[in-house]
Amino acid sequence: MDSVNIARRPTRLVRVGHVLVGSDAPVMVQSMTNTDTADAAGTAEQVYQLAQAGSEVVRITVNSPEAAARVAEIRQRLDDLGCDVPLVGDFHFNGDRLLKEFPDCARALAKYRINPGNVGKGAKGDDKFAFMIRTAMEHDKAVRIGVNWGSLDQALLARMMDANNRAANPLPLPKLMQEALIVSALESAEKAVEIGLSPDNIILSCKVSNVQDLISVYRELGGRCDYPLHLGLTEAGMGSKGIVASSAALAVLLQEGIGDTIRISLTPQPGEARTKEVVVAQELLQTMGLRSFTPLVTACPGCGRTTSTFFQELADHIQSYLRERMPVWRLQYPGVEDMKVAVMGCVVNGPGESKLADIGISLPGTGEVPVAPVYVDGQKDVTLKGDNIPAEFTAIVDNYVKTRYGEGGAKRREVASRTIPIRPVKA
């Protein structure tokens, strides 16, 4: 992957289980289950699927005694599967009671998510917040203080509205709401530090559901603290709308060096895999050049020269195959996540894109000779034809991974250079 020089916002370094967040650590991908946590088997299975898809931290709901009682079992089930992904407990309303009554839950989690807006009101709320912070200190756990637009601390908001009404130059209501989110997060972090929690165990988030509001809030929050920030557009929505909205907001902030963990909060389509939010988060980071997770396939959009759907089917097959193989490949073949593959539909851009990729195939368009040249490291390697092109090209990709990224392939990677012949344009 081409290097991208984006100056990251300086932050503290926080450890969440074995995962480092903030400072010079890579931007981390997070996800969340939608299972009933009281169903230990079902929750562990979904956590495992999310981790296999590439989620580096997984959040689970801890909302009842039944759920809290199964957290340790979920952790054990994952350990038995060889899955060490850190678990984050998502607490609302009754987190103090659940952590007190189920100490195994407190120990099994790597991080506690606390929402200042619903931990409790007044002195009672302060006591509940303090108990959760002290529990995190006792077990050396990280804490994310996560403020949400939809559950903002109403007492804080009322206090700020009163002060704003008395101000000589009052803020417009939308700006006041943004400021209330930021103040809630910063004041809660200050309270946690006063109680005794190390600043190096704190992550902040201020989530809203509007793209421009999210950008404004995080720009301001990022300039007023050195805590790592978790990015996410809450209630982003379903399908393409959710993907576009999340990407539009997060890409702007990431380009400015703001953000240390991200989650794409998609509403799944009926029957859709929960892992899609992980794939979208990875692809966002990878297309921005911030990280590499899996080889990505370059494919043309199609036009009148590509009336067949064959190249689309092959591109989809190859992308799916690469994702399926990555849990094994990332362990066996370091560097394979940077591999570039091209599946092109006709002679116009097909050969050129295929030469620019590590490995590429240029399929015949409408009216072209029914052959498909394959290019490896910029050079034409073989020409495929017939009904077995998908299987043959898949085998070529598989062999390329083994020879280039396997044992003995490191030297080849170091010395490999790509020469792309440029033909002069005829007058």
Curated annotation (Swiss-Prot):
It is an enzyme of class 1 (oxidoreductase). GO terms for molecular function: 4 iron, 4 sulfur cluster binding; 4-hydroxy-3-methylbut-2-en-1-yl diphosphate synthase activity (ferredoxin); 4-hydroxy-3-methylbut-2-enyl-diphosphate synthase activity (flavodoxin); iron ion binding. Its cofactor is [4Fe-4S] cluster. Pfam families: GcpE. SUPFAM superfamilies: Nitrite and sulphite reductase 4Fe-4S domain-like. It catalyses: (2E)-4-hydroxy-3-methylbut-2-enyl diphosphate + oxidized [flavodoxin] + H2O + 2 H(+) = 2-C-methyl-D-erythritol 2,4-cyclic diphosphate + reduced [flavodoxin]. Pathway: Isoprenoid biosynthesis; isopentenyl diphosphate biosynthesis via DXP pathway; isopentenyl diphosphate from 1-deoxy-D-xylulose 5-phosphate: step 5/6. Keywords: 4Fe-4S, Iron, Iron-sulfur, Isoprene biosynthesis, Metal-binding, Oxidoreductase. The keyword Transcription regulation does not apply. Its EC number is 1.17.7.3. Binds 1 [4Fe-4S] cluster. Gene3D superfamilies: Dihydropteroate synthase-like, Sulfite Reductase Hemoprotein, domain 1. One of its GO terms (biological process) is terpenoid biosynthetic process. [4Fe-4S] cluster binds at residues 300, 303, 346, 353. Converts 2C-methyl-D-erythritol 2,4-cyclodiphosphate (ME-2,4cPP) into 1-hydroxy-2-methyl-2-(E)-butenyl 4-diphosphate. Belongs to the IspG family. This is 4-hydroxy-3-methylbut-2-en-1-yl diphosphate synthase (flavodoxin). It comes from Chromobacterium violaceum (strain ATCC 12472 / DSM 30191 / JCM 1249 / CCUG 213 / NBRC 12614 / NCIMB 9131 / NCTC 9757 / MK). The gene is ispG.
